Amino acid sequence: MQKNLVIVESPAKAKTIEKFLGKDFKVLSSYGHIRDLKKKEFSIDVEKNFTPSYEIPADKKALVSTLKTEAKEAETVWLASDEDREGEAIAWHLYEVLKLKPENTKRIVFHEITKSAILKAIEQPRDIDLNLVNAQQARRILDRIVGFELSPVLWRKVKPALSAGRVQSVAVRLIVEREREIHAFQTEAAYRITAVFLVPDTDGKLVEMKAELARRIKTKEEAKAFLNACQGASFAIDDITTRPVKKTPPAPFTTSTLQQEAARKLGYTVAQTMMLAQRLYESGFITYMRTDSVNLSEFATTGSKDAIIKMMGDRYVHLRHFETKTKGAQEAHEAIRPTYMENQSVEGTAQEKKLYDLIWKRTIASQMADAELEKTTATITISGSSDVFTAIGEVIKFDGFLRVYRESYDDDNEQEDESHLLPPLKKGQKLEHGPIIATERFTQRPPRYTEASLVRKLEELGIGRPSTYAPTISTIQQREYVEKGNKDGEERQFNVMTLKDCQIKDENHTEITGAEKAKLFPTDTGTVVNDFLTEYFPDILDFNFTASVEKEFDEIAEGEVKWTSIMKNFYDKFHPSVENTLAIKTEHKVGERILGEEPGTGKTVSVKIGRFGPVVQIGTVEDEEKPRFAQMKKGQSMETITLEEALELFKLPRTLGEYEGKSVSVGVGRFGPYVLHNKVYVSLPKTLDPMEITLEEAEQLILEKRQKETERHIKKFEEEPELEILNGRYGPYITYKGSNYKIPKDIVPQDLSLASCLELIKLQDEKGPATTKKGRFAKKK
């Protein structure tokens, strides 16, 4: 009989832990949850105190059977799933499904995968915490109620196949509201006045000192008048203040701050950061990655101290204890940190190494001395004016934690990173001025959310928890309520007036403004669903209500309230509002917007959500003639499209002429404008407008596509039509029966025979599964 069976969540973790525990322990993985609510059913008996109905998915039945057999043969079963609510629920489901007995079942937890942590956990087992299980179950059931009851409402009122989630809907609302703020924003112009003064340095050599007027000037006329007044004015130092400034290091990483900083510094998505952090954790390199605690253990602070002294000396050490300030912080474990502070780097992929380096630096910096700076401010008066210029100098006297780590910001161009020292100055000193420049600047609209800034906003509002941020952001994109994308900037003119050598030079310049990268945009479907839910289910979309539900989950976890009473209070209000909304008859289809009338016919022109997305419609179902529909162009929005733009869409598709005896037309589809010839679609580049493209330009695009296709197909074999040698993005490869196979670099693809191809396929199949045509990163089922 096997003495001990340890069950963890992931196979990677199982391998690592088995090495620590020795021959008396067998470690197996549950591969996450082994059962869940039934997928196609409501699975909750409301009448019986919200009793859930769980099932073991088909792909987990063989695994569960294996675990049952192993559990029966073991003297003791150790449930070692993660130390959060989700992990506690996994342990409880294992206990129930495997029919374990309390006398030979032990629950153990650890927040780092090291030998000492695992052995300590074995020495300190506990029971399954049913309060944590109930908190997870309450979240799961509440989310099922919302999703299962709201989705049919959306199918009937908005569009088939839509779905709604509790936290996801609030996240979409934030993005929709930000988009509307941006469209409503009115840019205001003002002039920023800067001056260069020539001041002698310690060697008597004139150096430039930059200063800025303490206020912005509203109009060009005022700015010009100010420059004119400066022509005959004298300038002098009125006051000089020097004060010490200290900068304190940021706290160690929580889940959300790691997601934010990895996005800003490394360009990682929220999901990517969590995947890499999971790997680092399972390899034993970092502590548990789902936490809202900023606390460090004594082991970590001592390790940090030793590493700092060894690398930089005693002066750089300042041990700190950080307090968690997040609303409803629930996790008892530590911040995310390296398991051993002396390990400045680890083995792994390039991405894993970069993330580890970020975590190590942030943790070390948190236990380092403040940076000490000296800030000097000089006020410069202008004769005959109450206005003053201000020159600011800042110099680092002691770098402290900045030697290791500098925090990033969402808008890095707002951050002055260079320290500079002002030249020697004294009160009353007369100054000679160089150029004085008035530059027209504009107020900036609110920025769209990035994944990282959305996480920060959700955390500020107390919505979601460390385990829910990444799934929430992934889900709203998968449902196509939100899309991540880039926006090209627009050209804008601005005015610059320069006073130099007693003359004012007036010039207009151009700049590109408003360019954005990897930002979250609401789709038309997302906007319509948001507006519908906000109108008919205001509680679900209310930030405070959603945060209060999170607080109730925390109270369940603490054992302060019964989870069933929370469910009842919610359901008794929510369910009637669902039934009432289903009964309401609306005059127009939800989300429909009337743009005006078609000239000549007087028919109504509108935009609405159609079966395949947003469409423009001319006419109504009540008219004698059937309505006409046109798909909107990529980049057009239901909220902003004009009548003129809508009518233009009905000019497409248009026929350009014939090429090689076949018709050539241009149109717009779901993925943008295209040319169609002989059943072959060719995408239009951004430089060509579908309303203006000529037949000759279309012919060129057709020929270019053919050339690319010719270059792509290297070799085919008549005797094996399913096998082909192709040229891909990463070089030549063999495709065969839905799988792709690499061709070694030292082989010329054109020289390969069918037998050689089949031999390469056989060799690679023996090593492991080939890449499918779905792509390297296709989800495993």
Tell what function each PLM region has.
Residues 1-141, 149-150, 214, 409-413, ...:
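Intrinsically disordered, low-complexity regulatory segments
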Residues 2-5, 16, 25, 151, ...:
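Basic, low-complexity terminal or inter-domain segments flanking catalytic cores
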Residues 16-20, 92-93, 172-179, 361:
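Short active-site loop/helix that positions an aromatic residue
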Residues 113-197, 242-246:
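C-terminal or mid-to-C-terminal helical accessory/interaction module adjacent to the motor/catalytic core
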Residues 217-252, 426-432, 439, 544, ...:
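Metal- or metallocofactor-binding catalytic centers and their adjacent structured scaffolds
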Residues 237-241, 248-262, 287-291, 445-457, ...:
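Short acidic, hydrophobic short linear motifs in intrinsically disordered regions
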Residues 259-261, 265-272:
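A conserved hydrophobic secondary-structure block that centers on an alpha-helix together
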